[in-house]
Each structure stands twice: as C-alpha cells, then as structure tokens.
Amino acid sequence: GVQKTETQAISPVPAEKLFKGSFLDMDTVVPKAFPEGIKSVQVLEGNGGVGTIKNVTLGDATPFNTMKTRIDAIDEHAFTYTYTIIGGDILLDIIESIENHFKIVPTDGGSTITQTTIYNTIGDAVIPEENIKDATDKSIQLFKAVEAYLLAN
C-alpha cells in the first residue's frame, strides 16, 4: 500500500542557505544542529550526489536506531532534494521504503519548505496514523533545529 503526507514550514533563512545546510551539507550540519535526532551520518557508497547511500545513526529523541538512505535527486537551482529510506529499524518490518521529497521556495525575507513523504508499505500493511504524525513532528523539529543552527552560524 501507499500512504502520503505533506507538510510545510516557513523560515527566515534564505532558500540557498537553507538548501545548502539542510541537504548539501547535511552530514555535518544535522548532527551538530539536532544530535538528539541524528547522531551521525556515514557514507557507505557514492560521493554525495544522486545514488549515494548513507547509514544514519539516530539519536535518543526517536525510538529507532538506524536508517539507510539513498539520494534520488538533487537540483541546486530549483532547491529540490529527494531521498528514500531503504533500510533500518525505522521501517518497522512493514514498510518497504519511505520517499522524502523536499522543495524550498524563496520568499520575501526567507523561504518556504514543503516536504512530501510517501510511505510504501509491504503488501496491505497500514502504518498507524500516530506513527505518521510523530514522523512529521520529528521532521519539523529537525527543520527548526537546522534553521536555528544556520541563523546562529
């Protein structure tokens, strides 16, 4: 089955800086900005571009330990970034993959980020709504932590 969510957040950080910090430099920025969510990121394959596979060690703010991700698309001009979670205990043994699509749009004095998440479950498995809501809340927490880090640095 497929379950889909979309969330949006407004930021005072300019689109280019937000894109760079959130995605291009995420391996170093995110663990510094939100260590309780993401402890470390290790590149398993690739050079940081499309096709790169990473192992992410999660922090104490989540009930999970790891996730394996694959970068699917990066557009530095359109400020879009897509990655898929393809492994780890975060998939709960009922999810085949989780696609995360991000788009940052410049606004007067900042930017707007939209995240579309597509959960591809195994067979007819259904992810409980509270799990999806919790994942969405964690994404917003992560975004706000990165935003605060970028504003301070």
From Swiss-Prot:
Disulfide bond entries: none
Localization per record: Cytoplasm
Keyword line: Cytoplasm, Endonuclease, Hydrolase, Nuclease, Pathogenesis-related protein, Plant defense
Top-rank taxon: Eukaryota
GO MF term (any one): endonuclease activity
Coiled coil start-end: none
EC number annotated for this UniProt entry: 3.1.-.-
Pfam families linked to this entry: Bet_v_1
Keyword rRNA-binding: no
Cytoplasm recorded as keyword: yes
Cellular-component GO terms for this entry: cytoplasm; nucleus
Enzyme class: hydrolase
GO BP terms in the entry: abscisic acid-activated signaling pathway; defense response
UniProt cross-references to PANTHER family, sorted A to Z: OS08G0374000 PROTEIN-RELATED, STRESS-INDUCED PROTEIN SAM22
Function: Catalyzes the two-stage endonucleolytic cleavage to 3'-phosphomononucleotides and 3'-phosphooligonucleotides with 2',3'-cyclic phosphate intermediates.
Protein family membership: Belongs to the BetVI family.
Name listed for the protein in its UniProt record: Ribonuclease 2
Species of the source: Panax ginseng (Korean ginseng)
